[in-house]
């Protein structure tokens, strides 16, 4: 009986030591992270911009940014999208009622103004458009939108 008791105690002690070592491995200090890299910030902007695009722009400009022939212009590699950010921001804020010509094709549907969107939302969606559908351009910032909004009122 004593022998069984000693074996049992030894077994319990061995289990306790093994548990303690496993526990120490789990609680080992980890590296602390510093400020997130800019790519993480761009990723967040793109995710937010995609949500705005899906709720505001998708119907006219389509999921692939290709637009609708002779009605709604494409957002793929055009000077409107990749060019002057001020013009693009103004277009978002004020809309457009006259036809627009892109690559020798005229588009006739008016674009409604989207001034109800916040500076952040406009910056996010324009950054999304400028970096989706095969586009590659600099981000639009909320500060840039705020500046243009103040001028076009």
Put a short name on every predicted segment.
Residues 1-26:
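Bacterial Sec-dependent N-terminal signal peptides
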Residues 21, 152-153:
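Short, solvent-exposed mixed-charge patches
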Residues 25-52, 148:
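Electrostatic cytochrome c docking/interface patches
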Residues 69-76, 97-152:
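Axial heme c-ligation environment in periplasmic c-type cytochrome domains
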């Amino acid at each position: 009986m004593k022998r069984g008791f000693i074996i049992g105690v030894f077994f319990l002690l061995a289990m306790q030591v093994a548990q303690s070592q496993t526990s120490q491995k789990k609680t080992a200090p980890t590296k602390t992270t510093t400020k997130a890299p800019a790519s993480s910030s761009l990723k967040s902007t793109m995710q937010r911009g995609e949500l705005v695009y899906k709720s505001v722009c998708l119907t006219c400009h389509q999921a692939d940014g290709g637009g609708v022939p002779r009605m709604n212009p494409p957002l793929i590699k055009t000077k409107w999208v990749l060019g002057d950010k001020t013009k693009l921001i103004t277009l978002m804020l004020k809309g457009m009622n006259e036809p627009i010509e892109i690559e020798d094709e005229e588009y006739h549907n008016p674009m409604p103004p989207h001034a109800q969107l916040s500076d952040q939302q406009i910056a996010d969606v324009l950054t999304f458009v400028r970096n989706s559908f095969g586009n590659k351009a600099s981000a639009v910032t909320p500060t840039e939108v705020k500046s243009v909004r103040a001028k076009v009122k």
